[in-house]
């Protein structure tokens, strides 16, 4: 990694320099099993209205990636019987990239007054905290969704209705320098509220 990104010298240096990596450009080493448990434990500090923990994490080890690729291919061909070679190769690549793969499920709790929307927000924050924890251990991460996150057969590999795949989080070591991407201008997303005078 370059000094420009994911500066771990302090929290106030890390946050404005945080940068994801491309999973296809991640190489070994990745987090150990002990480090992964620590990463998930850190993510448990996520804001969670009602203390519902509406999320789950499944680790897919390297020796299971071949089977995952086969299941992704099967599900894709069921949905798209005319799928081309390049589409199937992309799924194969996705299943095998990066040393570490965590699948995060949004697991809503229906027997509560807490709105599903708030539970979704908590799940997104949980994913982000996993990413921060991965970077804190001096690895790089990438959170992706795409077709597999929205296919029910893929979801059923890891969970069941009403659960949904919130994302596939990959982790490892960056193979080369990270590059910046465009960010929104601050004044586009930040403003101050002022009350309007009443007539």
Predicted regions and their residues:
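Acidic-glycine-rich active-site phosphate/pyrophosphate-binding loop
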Residues: 77, 96-109
């Amino acid at each position: 990694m370059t000094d420009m990104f994911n500066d771990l010298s302090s929290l106030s240096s890390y946050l404005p320099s945080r940068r994801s990596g491309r999973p296809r450009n991640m190489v070994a080493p990745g987090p150990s099993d002990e480090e992964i448990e620590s990463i998930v434990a850190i993510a448990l500090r996520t804001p969670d209205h009602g203390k519902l923990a509406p999320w789950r994490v499944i680790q897919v080890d390297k020796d299971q990636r071949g089977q995952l690729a086969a299941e992704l291919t099967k599900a894709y061909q069921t949905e798209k019987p005319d799928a081309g070679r390049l589409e199937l190769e992309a799924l194969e690549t996705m299943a095998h990239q990066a040393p570490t793969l965590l699948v995060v499920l949004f697991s809503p709790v229906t027997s509560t007054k807490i709105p599903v929307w708030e539970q979704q927000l908590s799940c997104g924050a949980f994913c982000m905290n996993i990413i921060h924890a991965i970077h804190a251990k001096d690895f790089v991460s990438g959170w992706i969704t795409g077709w597999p996150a929205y296919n029910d057969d893929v979801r059923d590999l890891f969970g069941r209705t009403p659960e949904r795949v919130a994302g596939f989080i990959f982790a490892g070591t960056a193979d080369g320098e990270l590059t910046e991407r465009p960010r929104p201008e601050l004044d586009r997303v930040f403003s101050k509220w002022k009350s309007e005078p009443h007539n």
